Amino acid sequence: MRKMRIYEYAKEKNLSSKEVIEKLKGLNVHVSNHMSVIDEKTITLLEGNGNQKQGGSGKPEQQKKAGEKKPAQDHGQRKPNTAPAKANNQHDRSQGSDQQKGKAQDGGQKPKHKGNKNKKQHQKNNNNKRNQRGRGRQPEMNKAKPLPEKVTFSGSLTVGELAEKLNKEPSELIKKLMFLGVMATINQELDKDSIELICEDYGVEVEEEVIIDETDIESYVVEDDPSLLKERPPVVTIMGHVDHGKTTLLDSIRNTKVTEGEAGGITQHIGAYQVTVEGKKITFLDTPGHAAFTTMRARGAQVTDITILVVAADDGVMPQTKEAISHAKAAGVPIIVAVNKMDKETANPDRVMQELTEYELVPEAWGGETIFVNVSALTGTGIDELLEMVLLVAEVEELKANPDRLARGTVIEAELDKGRGPVATLLVQSGTLKVGDPIVVGSTFGRVRAMVNDEGRRVKAVGPSTPVEITGLNDVPQAGDQFQAFADEKKARSIGEARATRQKEEERAETSKVSLDDLFNQIQQGEVKEINVIIKADVQGSVEAMRGSLEKIDVEGVKINIIHTGVGAITESDIILAAASNAIVIGFNVRPDGGAKRTAEQEKVDIRLHRVIYNAIEEIEAAMKGMLDPEYEEKIIGQVEVRTTFKVSRIGTIAGSYVTEGKIVRDATVRLIRDGVVIYEGSINALKRFKDDVKEVAQGYECGITLENFNDIKEGDIIEAYVMEEIERT
């Protein structure tokens, strides 16, 4: 039975192997490739199919010519190839035996020559076939690929990368760049302008990809169409000095406006609440105290629209009142002054107005822009007028938001409830939050399971400037965290998990704080256009002198903004304000207390302490100009508290002391601090434990100390020991 490979049959019939394979598929004969073997039956099928097609082709002359040529090819090619392997072996053996017997006849030699001839012919045909195959592919390789409609890139592209995107040879692009006056190599990076010029020359559109960090909630903020914005309630925070009536005022507003007309309504403390005045709502944040206000602002949460500054009419401006003013001004929030306790006989509102003018809060009655309202939180007098003024300021501020979008806002409070799990009070700042919304809150995520408003009622949806308590989060967020609702729960989950992972890695990465050491570099890089400064000094005169000197410093492109001043020790509140405002704290003849030191280390706030005003001014000016000399850093090694004093003739005052922190060393430099103010700075004259002179005394032990040329030591004084260490500027 005759058998042959597909490529042999194709060659015999002057067809391509592909055409033969297609014919076989049409006859339902399965073959894998051109090397597959077909038997005589299949060949008959093929020839029968081919004859039918040829019969209808209308070219008898060509068929006849092909038929005349085929026998010669059959005789030359098929005879050695189609013979079975066994026959060939027998032929070789018989040929070898004939040679051994000496039968070297012409007939015996012919098959050998014929075999060699056929072998050469076969190789020649194979070479022809390879050449034909190569020639067949060549046009496909050289065929030019079409130009793309658009080229996208991020940042920059090399010449080679751009050539690949344009389906062009790099050499072609290099020539174009040469015409543009740019000498480039294949690996040279091209800027945006060069990429756009080349693509424009080819008529291809260019689009720069903007890489968005999906874990950054801020990147999902889309600017709303002004036509979609609607008026929203103002968010109000009440601030002021201790015992000036902040909490009483909050309670008075709540009792007069929340409970009236809502008999049987349950008021639930969720950290914020709403009141309705003349058909309009006002949201109050129930977070009296500057720490909460400032901590949220330090973490990027600007939630307050208006600040009500409460000042007692019988007490006037107090230290925390000044702090509250500084906090509100640093946040850029309008201030309404509520002069409280007007029901008291000793009330003197004119004195309050006079004192507040020193802090640029001038009453409207005196030609200023600050609204003053006389109120009594106890009797309820002036509450309505105060709320009307809040609405007036809100109207001037034009507070608007788009309710028809996915909600976003800020966490006011959060806690872990034993029965309900993580619970968070959110303030929706834009959009509408609905039950069932997937949500990312800080580094947590979840689905809003239930929402309760400030009246304790379950709600299904809340709009802008509305506080609401939600459940359904996987963890407890922190106050000040931003939240964003999503349409897709999978996306919310992936972003929440990515943010949680990043938080673990970075441990809530700190924002870069301004410090004098790195001030010049930050100015050069354009990161700092304004230096916020907090001044604390021992007396008011020093504060004013320091303020005047600092404001005279003139360095091109940078100005000094004094956000807060005060008299006395540097407190934790000062450090919190500095952290929130990215400020430097300058102390003149004062020291930070223990809490302030710890907070400054945690928040990385730069504290500069001086005893000469000129030195402070010179240091800041040099820092702004990038000319700071290598500095000596003060390292506190110990602190002792004076428990009692003894006066001994010829020796002076001996301080009976107790080491509260670190250790006190005989050779260290010390300073004596009284009520946060430095009274003395010098060295130790004698350090004794019982009657023995000692070199040092560790924490938890008592000792006796005398100071060099100083005897005005009193009980309660703090003696601080320190050494100066030289540090390199970075």
Swiss-Prot record:
GO terms for cellular component: cytosol. Residues 61-77, 89-104, 137-148 have a biased composition (Basic and acidic residues). Residues 376-378 are annotated as: G5. Residues 110-123 have a biased composition (Basic residues). Residues 265-269 are annotated as: G2. Residues 340-343 are annotated as: G4. Residues 240-247 are annotated as: G1. Keywords: Cytoplasm, GTP-binding, Initiation factor, Nucleotide-binding, Protein biosynthesis. Residues 286-289 are annotated as: G3. Residues 48-151 are annotated as: Disordered. GO terms for molecular function: GTP binding; GTPase activity; translation initiation factor activity. Residues 231-400 form the tr-type G domain. It is found in: Cytoplasm. GTP binds at residues 240-247, 286-290, 340-343. InterPro entries: EF-G-like_DII, IF2_II, IF2_N, P-loop_NTPase, Small_GTP-bd, T_Tr_GTP-bd_dom, TF_IF2_bacterial-like, TIF_IF2. The keyword Nucleus does not apply. HAMAP family: IF_2_B (MF_00100_B). Belongs to the TRAFAC class translation factor GTPase superfamily. Classic translation factor GTPase family. IF-2 subfamily. One of the essential components for the initiation of protein synthesis. Protects formylmethionyl-tRNA from spontaneous hydrolysis and promotes its binding to the 30S ribosomal subunits. Also involved in the hydrolysis of GTP during the formation of the 70S ribosomal complex. This is Translation initiation factor IF-2. It comes from Halalkalibacterium halodurans (strain ATCC BAA-125 / DSM 18197 / FERM 7344 / JCM 9153 / C-125).
